[in-house]
Amino acid sequence: MVLEVKNLSFKYSQKLILDKLSFSVPKNSITSILAPNGSGKTTLLKCLLGLLKPLEETEIKACNKDILPLKPYEKAKLIAYIPQVEYYAFNFSVLDFVLMGKATHLNLFAMPKAKHIKEATSVLERLDLESLKDQGINDLSGGQRQMVLLARSLLQRTPLLLLDEPTSALDLKNQALFFDAIKDEMKKRELSVLVNIHDPNLVARHSTHVVMLKDKKLFLQASTPIAMTSHNLSALYDTPLEAIWHDDKLVVYAL
């Protein structure tokens, strides 16, 4: 397993948000987190990254390393993260922003070399972003920024990638391009993905495994075909839903 989580609990003040979650992310997989709104999906990702501190009984291992005591630069060698669309304090050019993905591969204060710039440019070309490389990151649309964040994460070359609602600002074309780029990368090297998505249809289309959360706890973890059924989805969302599989594609609608 690339990621193993045991007894993850988290409180805001005295309010319990996550209660003893235990789940894992297999190698070379895309595991989606699916849950009703307000279930702590983003909080979970921030706990995994160390941006929020879970309760003491929590155990989190990435690539068999206990990541809670690791320093930020050590975590950055294991985990890349794409948050929901953000505005940045400094308006870096797209190329410079993507090159930050190489920071953990360079010595302190070292400048990127020609080979790093070539690699960054190649990733931008793959994502149809080369024409934007000289623009400021804050001058882009939300969807364009998400694609640039993906480029930076791919350049980081970590074994684990965490995504928080990565397609919320993307049109249908770029949603497909986004996940196609990740799947292409998975064919080249070992890469596992944990992604927070709210759309069950996207989960079914792109995920190999699903983690469902409900009432602060783990509701279900299973492979996608087993997890994404009418029974499970109706129970998860407390509303009657029909899930129909056809040619390995899922359509979910309310009854």
From Swiss-Prot:
The keyword rRNA processing does not apply. It holds the Pfam family ABC_tran. SMART domains: AAA. Keywords: ATP-binding, Cell inner membrane, Cell membrane, Ion transport, Iron, Iron transport, Membrane, Nucleotide-binding, Transport. ATP binds at residues 35-42. GO terms for cellular component: plasma membrane. The keyword Signal does not apply. Part of a binding-protein-dependent transport system for an iron chelatin. Probably responsible for energy coupling to the transport system (Potential). This is Probable iron chelatin transport ATP-binding protein jhp_0821. It comes from Helicobacter pylori (strain J99 / ATCC 700824) (Campylobacter pylori J99).
